Amino acid sequence: MTGSWANALWETAPRAQIEAAATARVLQVIGDAYQRVPFYRWFYERAGLRPALLRTLADVRREVPFVTKADLLEFQDAPGWQALDQAGVRQFHLTSGTSGAGREFHVRDTEDLAALGTGGAYSLLWAGLRPGDRILLTIPYSQTMAGPYFQAACEAAAVSVTATICR
């Protein structure tokens, strides 16, 4: 954090630089997902999408379909549906199933867990919290990923956390 900026490089960059970086990264993620994740290869092919033909964010908005819960549930039982090498898995999560439409299964590796709080840290800093501030975290840890997410966000923002146990 520099002054009032969480990341001065990107928060003060010219719009064209931000858009160019975002475009490159989005296209890379879509291409990597197609190459590495059986679910996305199946999903994109079913939609007739060829990621190599995407060039702009406008192409992405126009051509890339949204993934629905029904899509995830349809493919979830297929072998190898996730991109992670199972040896690298550090955490497993199920959704709560409150929608009644089945439960989604999610896995996270060390890199996922290390990056977990980064986005949340920005929101805390943008909301006015500063390193050394204290926060009382009352989100249940045992029920959802929200508790660990907010804890990681506070840690990434260097905000002190007091967590309560809520059941």
Where are these predicted regions, by residue range?
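AMP-binding/adenylate-forming
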Residues: 110-122, 134-167
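Short helix-loop-beta connector
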Residues: 129-133
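Nucleotide 5′-phosphate-binding alpha/beta core
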Residues: 1-118, 122-126
